């Protein structure tokens, strides 16, 4: 409960999602702000989002160009591993590209994005007024604050600590670069968490609608036959509305989510190479250099936590929500058996089942990649296989360097 000490008691879905959407807005990755416990689109919010993106790009590459102009920085880069430098350059390029895609796509779909929350709020109002449902916004808000607070703290500490360690006389520039890098990479990360939270919200409502469809509850709560039939129709319409919301989420997040997932998958494999491949060479330097290498690898491991968590956990939430949606539809199929005296329900059930066959609704990202547990298995196998290949490559590279050193030593010994 201490987590919610500084936050007002959530009463609507806007209050529940406010914390995570504020973070997304501060990163410039949505086009609506928060005013009086609701979300609104204005020219000010649009201008702010674009200004944050432009400022982050300018400061990021401006500070980088100034740093690269320093002689000592160029000397340190000349001594660095070429593959690590290539990976770092690729990470910077992909991160800025993904951030730009995320900002532009969510600006374009800002009204549809806002419409998802408005439709969800309207559905919640019907659940509370007609069925007396308790949606437990407090629990959801507490979870968002705890998870994102921990992940954000770890991410900021890792990036800024690494910047301070490598600063060596250019601390202000490195910290500015680290701040801009945090915004550029954090925006897509928070967007992924928002998508994950929306999927979880829909799953909670699907489970609630399953309880409302139980004949025991309907007979106890609505004994009048005409009221009971009205409530059944309302529940069925809300189930269909939640399915439409899944389709709307897919449209809004298609491009930004696909770009972020491609970036996370590509960079996770590369960062794993740096972690495990470079650790092979630790121990061959002096004690001070070894300590510095271990600290940098530790910072890198912490930076990997947010993208890996999002990459592997988000499909699980999506898959579970689809599972709950299918359970709702199976309960709707049984309405004919539970209420045989209500012949007017038969056309409703038949139309919904026909719509279900045609729709085949799933959570997807761009290129129609279905977000499910199969995707988690695919991502995990890719990461493991790449890890093994990269470790083998790193060990081969180190072995080649050792052979070259032995060759040079032998040539010096025989006098060549």
Curated annotation (Swiss-Prot):
It comes from the Eukaryota. GO terms for cellular component: axon; dendrite; membrane; neuronal cell body; plasma membrane. InterPro entries: 7TM_chemorcpt (IPR013604). Glycans are attached at residue 290. GO terms for biological process: chemosensory behavior; male courtship behavior; monoatomic ion transmembrane transport; sensory perception of taste; signal transduction. Residues 35-48, 105-143, 193-295, 396-416 are extracellular. Residues 1-13, 70-83, 165-171, 317-374 are cytoplasmic. It is found in: Cell membrane. GO terms for molecular function: ligand-gated monoatomic ion channel activity; taste receptor activity. Keywords: Cell membrane, Glycoprotein, Membrane, Receptor, Transducer, Transmembrane, Transmembrane helix. It is a multi-pass membrane protein. It holds the Pfam family 7tm_7. Signal peptide: none annotated. The chain crosses the membrane at residues 14-34, 49-69, 84-104, 144-164, 172-192, 296-316, 375-395. In larvae, is expressed in neurons of the terminal external chemosensory organ as well as in the dorsal pharyngeal sense organ. Belongs to the insect chemoreceptor superfamily. Gustatory receptor (GR) family. Gr57a subfamily. Probable gustatory receptor which mediates acceptance or avoidance behavior, depending on its substrates. This is Putative gustatory receptor 57a. It comes from Drosophila melanogaster (Fruit fly). The lineage of its organism: Eukaryota, Metazoa, Ecdysozoa, Arthropoda, Hexapoda. The gene is Gr57a.
């Amino acid at each position: 409960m201490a987590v919610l000490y500084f936050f007002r008691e959530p009463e609507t879905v806007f209050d529940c999602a406010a914390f995570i959407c504020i973070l997304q807005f501060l990163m410039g990755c949505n086009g609506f702000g928060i005013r009086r416990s609701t979300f609104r689109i204005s020219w000010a919010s649009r201008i702010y989002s674009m200004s944050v993106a432009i400022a982050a790009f300018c400061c990021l590459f401006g500070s980088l160009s100034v740093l690269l102009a320093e002689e000592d920085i160029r000397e340190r880069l000349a001594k660095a591993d070429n593959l690590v430098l290539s990976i770092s350059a690729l990470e910077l390029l992909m991160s800025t590209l993904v951030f730009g895609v995320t900002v532009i796509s969510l600006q374009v779909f800002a009204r549809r994005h806002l419409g998802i929350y408005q439709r969800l709020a309207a559905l919640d109002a019907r659940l509370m007024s007609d069925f007396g449902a308790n949606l437990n916004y407090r629990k959801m808000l507490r979870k968002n604050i705890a998870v994102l607070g921990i992940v954000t703290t770890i991410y900021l500490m890792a990036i800024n600590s690494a910047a301070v360690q490598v600063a060596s006389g250019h601390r202000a520039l490195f910290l500015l670069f680290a701040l801009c890098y945090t915004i550029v990479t954090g925006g897509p990360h928070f967007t992924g968490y928002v998508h994950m939270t929306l999927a979880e919200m829909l799953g909670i409502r699907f489970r609630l609608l399953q309880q409302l469809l139980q004949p025991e509850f309907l007979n106890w709560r609505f004994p009048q036959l005409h009221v009971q039939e009205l409530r059944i129709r309302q529940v069925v319409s809300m189930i269909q509305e939640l399915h439409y919301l899944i389709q709307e989420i897919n449209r809004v997040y298609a491009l930004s989510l696909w770009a972020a997932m491609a970036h996370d998958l590509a960079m996770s494999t590369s960062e794993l190479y740096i972690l495990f491949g470079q650790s092979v060479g630790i121990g061959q330097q002096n004690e001070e250099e070894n300590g510095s290498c271990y600290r940098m690898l530790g910072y890198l491991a912490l930076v990997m936590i947010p993208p890996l968590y999002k990459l592997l956990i988000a499909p699980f939430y999506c898959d579970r929500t689809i599972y709950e949606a299918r359970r709702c539809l199976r309960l709707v199929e049984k309405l004919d058996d539970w209420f045989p005296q209500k012949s007017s329900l038969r056309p409703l059930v038949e139309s919904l089942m026909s719509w279900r066959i045609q729709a085949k609704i799933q959570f997807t990202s761009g290129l129609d990649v279905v977000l499910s547990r199969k995707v988690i298995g695919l991502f995990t196998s890719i990461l493991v296989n790449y890890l093994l290949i990269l470790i083998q490559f790193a060990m081969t590279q180190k072995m080649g360097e050792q052979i070259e050193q032995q060759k040079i030593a032998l040539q010096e010994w025989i006098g060549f």
